[in-house]
A protein has these predicted regions:
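Residues that form or flank phosphate/diphosphate-binding pockets in enzymes
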Residues: 73, 90, 122
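Short glycine-rich hinge loops at helix-strand junctions in the catalytic core
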Residues: 90, 107-108, 131
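Conserved hydrophobic beta-strand within the GNAT/NAT acetyltransferase core sheet
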Residues: 111-116
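Conserved active-site alpha-helix within GNAT-family acetyltransferase domains
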Residues: 93, 118-136
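Conserved acetyl-CoA pyrophosphate-binding loop and the N-cap/start of the following alpha-helix
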Residues: 86, 90-99
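GNAT-family acyltransferases
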Residues: 1-77, 82-85, 101-102, 106, ...
Length: 162
């Protein structure tokens, strides 16, 4: 389940204070703190990402979001991460699928992209399960993936959240 991140919650987490949501063990992790810092430094009140929460008890186990608005070419890059104890349970796949479903309805978004470090097999498999295609080979430290919305994307239909 995705819950919008607010600047208030981001500031609280960065200050080591209660963000108003229950946190799971291992959250926030280092990458989450980096993303929250970027949100506070550069984002407006509605520019945050999303907290990934457990449906059973609402604990925050991770986060996901975009690295800014779509470019003129309709491409928007996403990022995501979970606290270590919650990886490998399908939570990340559900969260990224929900994020992509949200992006389907956003003006100007035609392609969703993601960068994955070479060797991060769980993240590679997650993107493949959701219909992303590899854009480039293993040169460098990251591999780049893309999903064209509305072009046979697995369950993602251009123009609505059906």
């Amino acid at each position: 389940m995705l819950v919008p991140q607010t600047l208030t919650a981001a500031r609280a987490l960065l200050a080591g204070e209660d963000p108003g949501l229950p946190l799971a063990a291992g959250y926030p992790h280092a990458d989450s703190l980096d993303a929250l810092r970027m949100q506070v430094q550069h984002g407006g009140p509605d520019d945050g990402g999303w907290f990934v929460t457990l449906a059973a008890d609402g604990r925050v186990v991770g986060d996901c979001g975009t690295f800014g608005p779509p470019g003129d070419d309709g491409r928007v890059e996403i990022g995501y991460g979970l606290a270590a104890p919650f990886r490998g349970q399908g939570i990340g796949t559900e969260a990224v699928a929900a994020l992509v479903e949200h992006l389907v309805g956003e003006p100007g978004v035609r392609v969703v992209t993601a960068s994955v470090e070479v060797g991060n097999e769980p993240s590679r498999r997650l993107l493949e399960r959701l219909g992303f295609s590899l854009t480039d080979g293993p040169a460098g430290t990251d591999r780049h993936w893309h999903l064209e919305l509305g072009v046979g994307a697995q369950g993602f239909v251009d123009g609505g959240n059906d």
